[in-house]
Amino acid sequence: MAYALNFDAEGERFYEVGTKHGVIYPWDTTQQGYGQGVAWNGLTGVTESPSGGDETSFWADDMKYFTRRGNEEFGLSIKAFYYPDEFAECDGTAKLAKGVRIRQQTRKRFAFTWETTRGNDTEGDAYGSVIHIAYGVTASPSSKDNSTINDSADVSDFTWECSTTPVTYPGYKPTSVIDIDISDYKDAETDTDGFDAAVEWLLETLYGKSDIAEFSATATYAKGDLVVHGGSGMEAVYEAKAAISTAGAWSSDDWLKIADGTAVPARVPSISEVADHFPAVAAG
C-alpha cells in the first residue's frame, strides 16, 4: 500500500548541533541603543530556557468552558571558558583603573547572537546554519568555582543565567528572540527572492565589514554600495545614497558617512530591519 506521507526521506532527516560565533552588543547609554558588537571567544554552550505559557482551565456549566495560556518569557544560559572585556559591565563589574575592577555594580543589558549548525543525512553539518538574536538580555550573578591545580587537565568555566525583556514588532506578540535559518532557501536554483543578498547583509551587519574598497573616480556605484574615502588617518566609510551611473570625482552630496576608519563596526539589527531584508520570510 502506498501512503501520501513519505517518512524519513533521503535528505530530510534533520538535526541541530553546536554553538559558535557568539557576539555581544552592550547597551550604549549615550546613544540609547545597542553599541558595537564584540566577538565572544571561548563560547562553549548556550541553553535556551523559555518559561511561562502555562495553561489555566476555566469551568462553567459543569464542564471545562475554555483554557487560556499566560505569556511566555525567554531565558538563556551562556557558558564559556572566558568572556570579552566588554561583557564586564554586563556582569556588574566596573573598571576603576587599569587592572582594577569593582564588583556588584549596575548590570548593563545587552543583545546577544549565536549560531548553531543545522545538518541532515546527506550533507551532514555542511547543510546550513541558524542564527539566533536575543534582545534585552541581562545576566544574573553566578557562582565560580576555583580549585587547586592537580593532575587533571580540566579548566574552570563560567556560566551566566540570563533573562530578557521582549521588544515589540507590529502584528505579533512582543518577543525577545528571533531565529534566521540560512538553510531555508539553499535549494533554490536562482536567487530570485534576494535571499542570498539578505543573508550577506545580515552577516555583514552582525559581524561587521572590513574588505571595503577605496572610492574610485573611474567606477560607477549602485545604491547602498560602500566605499572608503579620505586622506591617511582621516578615512571613513561612506554609503551611496542613490545609484551613481556616471563615473567622476568625489561628491559629498552622493554619499552618506557610515563610520570612521576603514571598516563598518558590527551591530545588531532590529527585528524590523531583518524583516525588511527578508521579505519572503516576513510574508511567510
What are the residue ranges of the model-derived segments?
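Oligomerization/assembly interface segments of phage tail-like spikes and tubes
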Residues: 48-88, 152-167
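Structured, beta-strand-rich domain cores
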Residues: 64-136, 140
